[in-house]
Amino acid sequence: MKSAITFLLTVVIVLSISDVAFSQKTAADQCFFKASSLHFTVSGMEYWYDKARGGLESITGVPYSDLGCKNCHIAACDVCHKAEQDGKLVYSNEAATNQDMCLKCHAREASMMKINEKLGTPDVHHTAGLKCTDCHTAREMHGDGTKYISMKQEGAMDVNCEQCHDKITKSISHIIHRSKLDCKACHVQQVVSCTNCHFETMVKEGKRVAIPVSGWSFLMNYNGKVTSANMQTFVASGNKTFMIFAPQFSHSVSKEGKKCEDCHNTANDKEIDNGAMNLTWLDGGEVKQASGIIPVVDGVLYNSVFQNYESGKWTPIADPVKPKVQYVGFGTPLSEKQFKKLLKSQKSQK
């Protein structure tokens, strides 16, 4: 970290001597992060969208290069590091480490924080006063010279729970699950999902419209362990539908983990065991949803409401095409053996 800070300061000094002012937008090729930073390359979104990998492009027919998604990502250093001092624009590390700067782009995390506060179940790290850069490193932000295809790729991220929580209490849950479950599987309270993302509205009007859903969390495999995950659904031209599942850390963490009965032999498990589960449905014109822990199992039909968005209104699609399902972020569904273990009743022990 010290070497990264030293290098960063050197860059600042060089820029100052060269009279490169932030009053003019700094070109990305003048900034050391261009070669590998996911903030700049946007590789993750493009990689999973690609039709060659069974991505959303397979039903939209629109190349990623034609989408505006890539334009939201960081094109130059000054997007994060620009600040005003004495009426002049200056380079600032303080501006870049301000949490509000991160939340300008990371809207899902901002939404999760608001939901947590509304429910009175704030994230333990947020309550403790931690901010994004207390966990996420400069290498993650600026890259290290390696071109990662996704933030989920091994080696792309430094942050993990064990960096701070090196001593784990010897509870029954930890003894049984520690080698098989990631911390997030039990300690993430919920995730917020974007459902019914309307692709045509995004392309034609440049607007992102979707129906947010929270109060649940999914389980899938990632890096050899079961972890928390999320889902997202899309509607494209011709009433084509799409569903993705991916590992996700929602920044909604509780000190107390899940109880055994929150995951084992639940109503959700029983639905899934029968081959289908209703994730969302309509009740009096209002979208309702499942809640709790939802295992991701291949071959199961996860039913969801699909709607068209026209003139500012959602209209249910009478007979939507069965959604194509994609597992992204290097996540994989639970195996049959793993799911069968979830079907066994377990009671929490003190």
Ranges and model annotations:
Residues 1-6:
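Positively charged n-region of N-terminal signal peptides that target proteins for export
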Residues 7-16:
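Bacterial N-terminal signal peptides
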Residues 22-98, 103-180, 212-254, 289-294, ...:
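Sequence context of c-type cytochrome heme-c attachment sites
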Residues 86-87, 111-112, 140-143, 169-170, ...:
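Flexible loop/turn segments at secondary-structure boundaries
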Residues 123-124, 137, 188, 260, ...:
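Histidine-centered catalytic micro-motifs
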Residues 168-213, 266:
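Repeat-solenoid scaffold signature
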Residues 256-261, 268-296, 328:
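C-terminal/domain-terminus segments
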